[in-house]
UniProtKB/Swiss-Prot annotation:
Name of the featured protein: Deoxyuridine 5'-triphosphate nucleotidohydrolase
Recorded metabolic or biological pathway in which this protein acts: Pyrimidine metabolism; dUMP biosynthesis; dUMP from dCTP (dUTP route): step 2/2
Family: Belongs to the dUTPase family.
GO biological process: dUMP biosynthetic process; dUTP catabolic process
Cross-referenced SUPFAM superfamilies: dUTPase-like
Function as written in the Swiss-Prot or TrEMBL entry: This enzyme is involved in nucleotide metabolism: it produces dUMP, the immediate precursor of thymidine nucleotides and it decreases the intracellular concentration of dUTP so that uracil cannot be incorporated into DNA.
Cofactor dependence: Mg(2+)
Transmembrane stretches, start-end: none
């Protein structure tokens, strides 16, 4: 298991609310909580930036973190990430924030300490551009959306 440096920015973490942890041995994501001052109403169409009370430092340029939505919030309530996916670079050290967007038809209350997103570590491969005049021919070529087959 990879060590991940973290700072607790909200003293309720570790006291009222647990540190993020994997729910099972097969879990890929660590749940992030809404460390709000009070329960907050998110109206339909509204987007709100939610603090998590944590900052992390990955440090390894071969890793990054993704902030992803929790499936239940999106499916049951229409609460998804405003930026769809949050990318945390290995050299970022600021507070993890979650952009919540209510794409549903009814207002939703985000409770203090509610699990609102998940953090997943992923490998990173950095590339450099090699400029060419032409590409080697491929089966797909320049075919865009819908060109790899139907159903």
């Amino acid at each position: 298991m990879h060590a991940l440096q973290a700072k607790i920015l909200d003293p309720r973490i570790g006291n009222e609310f647990p540190l993020p942890a994997y729910a099972t041995v097969g879990s890929a994501g660590l749940d992030l909580r809404a460390m709000l001052k009070e329960d907050t109403l998110l109206e339909p169409g509204q987007t709100l930036l939610i603090p998590t009370g944590l900052s992390i430092y990955i440090g390894d340029p071969g890793l990054a973190a993704l902030i992803l939505p929790r499936s239940g919030l999106g499916h049951k309530h229409g609460i998804v990430l405003g930026n769809l996916v949050g990318l945390i670079d290995s050299d970022y050290q600021g507070e993890l924030m979650v952009s919540c967007w209510n794409r549903g038809q009814t207002a939703f209350t985000i409770a203090v300490g509610e699990r609102i997103a998940q953090l997943v570590l992923v490998p990173v491969v950095q590339a450099r551009f090699e400029l060419v005049e032409e590409f080697d021919e491929s089966q797909r070529g320049t075919g865009g959306f819908g060109h790899s087959g139907s159903h």
